[in-house]
């Protein structure tokens, strides 16, 4: 699943910087305890920009931790969302598929978990009017869903995320800016899904961009991933 070359999103996947530390933050969805990670910048920008990070289907991992730490070193408040719950950590791809599949089918539940994580990011100090969402794979789908749900975010970035939406769902106007970074050879996103997504963005009157990277496949930002080509 690894790209044959790494795209220009390197700034979000750099080595961990010593200038920021991660802090565990517990929060709740009714009785379900969620446990995210917060990274607060040492040098605070007056605009207090915030970035919500939605991890891939296995939940919070080393990659999302690295991204949060690097963003904080760049001056952003960063928060890694826990979508599944503190007691739900997938041990393998089968469990990850089952858990992520539940939220894809029950999209309002996914929206709720994203919204709760956004609230925690603001509690950590981020400016509620200056937040973006970035997501990887399953989290990339979540980033697009944050835009579809018109959550209070300035923009979203989806990296090798699923683009599909239930055709029965209404397409509403999207106010957040949308950036999709996609592997041109991703075997999990068919051309018809790409076409439907682009038509959806036009119907939604979104300010959107979609960059397709040649020879890049699924999970191209994951250093430990394989190669589908």
Range-by-range predicted roles:
Residues 24-124, 221-229:
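Serine-hydrolase catalytic machinery in alpha/beta-hydrolase-like enzymes
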Residues 118-121, 125-136:
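Alpha/beta-hydrolase fold nucleophile elbow
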Residues 135-139, 143:
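Gly/Ala-rich beta-loop-alpha elbow adjacent to hydrolase catalytic centers
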Residues 185-189, 218:
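Acidic catalytic loop of the alpha/beta-hydrolase fold
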